[in-house]
Curated annotation (Swiss-Prot):
One of its GO terms (biological process) is single fertilization. Pfam families: Glyco_hydro_18. PROSITE patterns: GH18_2 (PS51910). This is Oviduct-specific glycoprotein. Belongs to the glycosyl hydrolase 18 family. It comes from Papio anubis.
Length: 623
């Protein structure tokens, strides 16, 4: 018997280290149904097998009690949303309260006394159980900022602790599964330092949704990508940096969920001819036909935009952008989604969060690649692959250019580049210049050298592409995506500045048709931040970043170092979703005493009395 238990334990350990049991957390907004025509989405339009957790955004608050935003939510949308669990009994649903437009004042009032918090908690349990939700998501943007007093940082912790205590007590009394508790948090370092005690949040919450997007947008004077996977060492604005920062501060990796947007941020260019990354911008581009927000396009709107646009790929950020005339959009597509999914698996994070499910191409009518083309990629890599008996899809994936460490060994990047690629039609077929063919099981070695989150550095030499069992010297820049065709923009081999490539015949070629700019004196990227809840109708910029523009469209990473990680690729299957095993196993945690206060210096002091006062000055409202 003990041998059987030992074997089962070993299997579970190996499964954990293989990255299994990833969460795919998807938000659905209660204003999705109000979009016109084919963009109007109701809960019954959603695929219940795509995500492990669905979160309904948002509930509101009245008189320190959680309430539905309107009667339609409670009478129609809540029941329809939770009815999805009849089709997938492993699906978990949560109700989120807050959001950008919600502000902070009602949170502050509710948090201010123990009696107010008790009243709120009782209303939460009642509402969740009445409508068959499995948990609560706290979307408080942000404790200690935007008009919230500094002591909200600690009263927010008290609320979370008291919610968890009440959820456990209710579960014991009713013999029902305990209600889940999650929170959406900023990925921007100065907001994290002001608003959160990371270790306590990591101990108490079931999972933490890191908002690792909205890192650049039309509130800035130069173009930048909304959600780059990686960035240069001097620039903390990337998804990888945000996730590593939370982990460095003590949050458990398995509880950290990386936020990924199904929308793009747009800019209006000063000059149509100056249309690269860090090009001068004069504001937001035109609103989308369905979302109707300047500076913002849902993915299903981006599919229409890129038909007549020129599409580009940012090699060191692993994300695309497109421009048409004076309009510019940075966004995520199926390729960048796959890179982000593999980054999550490789780094053993808890999973991915999608904002939002309803901004993907829900019915497959806009992009021509089937329903949910973005979220399907994430599901395929994070959820379905874990239970598949076939070999997992793999490809070369570089490590992060930047990390949360300031170790100079890990910040040895002085150059970066981008490479333009041809437009990819929504049908999934790649536009190529000479070669047009579908390549599967292709291994790509990126032409850059970059810094890893660990201290491992590897310099790449030749550009190689492995097809099956063969390895060849490439004569072109080759890209492949899961379910997409490969592209060969030209017949000449392009070599980054500072590297040489040996081709047959011992000829050495350097890049043709690309400008390379050495940023040895450091390239400064925007350091401002605009905090929003994407998709809401009022977006308020916080602060105005200052940037030093880089006047190029393409730069070369000759001095970068990189640790390649070997994976394989496979073609995406169609959107027939297979049932999955149990999605989540929640750990038991020890609840600390409610009579504590955590100071900014990390000291723990006892609190007395029911009311909380603080002598700490209010932090400037820099968002």
């Amino acid at each position: 018997m003990w041998k059987l238990l030992l074997w089962v334990g070993l299997v579970l350990v190996l499964k954990h280290h293989d990255g299994a049991a990833h969460k795919l957390v998807c938000y659905f907004t209660n204003w999705a149904h109000s979009r016109p025509g084919p963009a109007s989405i109701l809960p019954h339009d959603l695929d219940p097998f795509l995500c492990t957790h669905l979160i309904f955004a948002f509930a509101s608050m009245n008189n320190n009690q959680i309430v539905a935003k309107d009667l339609q939510d409670e009478k129609i949308l809540y029941p329809e949303f939770n009815k999805l669990k009849e089709r997938n009994r492993e699906l978990k649903t949560l109700l989120s309260i807050g959001g950008w437009n919600f502000g902070t004042s009602r949170f502050t009032t509710m948090l201010s006394t123990f009696a107010n918090r008790e009243k709120f908690i009782a209303s939460v349990i009642s509402l969740l159980r009445t409508h068959d939700f499995d948990g609560l998501d706290l979307f408080f943007l942000y404790p200690g900022l935007r008009g919230s007093p500094m002591h909200d940082r600690w009263t927010f912790l008290f609320l979370i602790e008291e919610l968890l205590f009440a959820f456990r007590k209710e579960a014991l009394l009713t013999m029902r599964p305990r209600l889940l508790l999650s929170a959406a948090v900023s990925g921007v370092p100065h907001i994290v330092q002001t608003s959160y005690d990371v270790r306590f949040l990591g101990r108490l919450l079931d999972f933490i949704n890191v908002l690792s997007y909205d890192l650049h947008g039309s509130w800035e004077k130069f173009t930048g990508h909304n959600s780059p996977l990686f960035s240069l060492p001097e620039d903390p604005k990337s998804s990888a940096y945000a996730m590593n920062y939370w982990r460095k501060l003590g949050a458990p990796s398995e509880k950290l969920i990386m936020g990924i947007p199904t929308y793009g941020r747009t800019f209006r260019l000063l000059k149509a001819s100056k249309n690269g990354l860090q090009a001068t911008a004069i504001g937001p581009a035109s609103p989308g036909k369905y979302t109707k927000q300047a500076g913002f396009l849902a993915y299903f709107e981006i599919c229409s935009f890129v038909w007549g646009a020129k599409k580009h790929w940012i090699d060191y950020q692993y994300v695309p952008y497109a421009n048409k005339g004076k309009e510019w959009v940075g966004y995520d597509d199926a390729i960048s989604f796959s890179y982000k999914a593999w980054f999550i698996r490789r780094e053993h994070f808890g999973g991915a969060m999608v904002w939002t499910l309803d901004m993907d191409d829900v019915r497959g009518t806009f992009c021509g690649t089937g329903p949910f083309p973005l979220v399907y990629v994430m599901n395929d890599i994070l959820v379905r692959a874990e239970f598949s008996s076939t070999s997992l899809p793999q490809f070369w994936l570089s490590s992060a250019v930047n990390s949360s460490s300031t170790d100079p060994e890990r910040l040895a990047v002085t150059k970066a580049w981008t490479t333009d690629i041809k437009i990819l039609p929504p049908g999934g077929e790649a536009g190529v210049t000479e070669i047009h063919g579908k390549c599967e099981n292709m291994t790509i070695t990126p032409r850059v050298t970059i810094v890893t989150p660990t201290k491992e550095t590897v310099s790449l030499g030749k550009h190689t592409v492995a097809l099956g069992e063969k390895t060849e010297i490439t004569g072109a820049t080759t890209m492949t995506s899961v379910g997409h065709q490969s592209m060969t923009p030209g017949e000449k081999a392009l070599t980054p500045v500072g590297h040489q490539s040996e081709l047959p015949g011992k000829k050495t070629l350097t890049p043709v048709g690309h400008q390379s700019v050495t940023t040895g004196q450091k390239t400064l990227i925007s350091v401002g931040y605009h905090s929003v809840t994407p998709g809401e109708k009022t977006l308020t910029p916080v602060g105005h970043p200052s940037v030093t523009p880089v006047s190029h469209q393409s730069v070369s990473p000759g001095g970068m170092t990189m640790t390649p990680v070997h994976f394989q690729t496979e073609t995406l299957r169609q959107n027939t979703m297979a049932p999955r095993r149990k999605a989540v196993a929640h750990e038991k945690v020890t609840v600390p005493s409610r009579k504590i206060s955590v100071t900014p210096e990390g000291q723990t002091v006892p609190l007395r009395g029911e009311y909380l006062t603080s002598e700490t000055g209010t932090h400037p409202q820099d968002g």
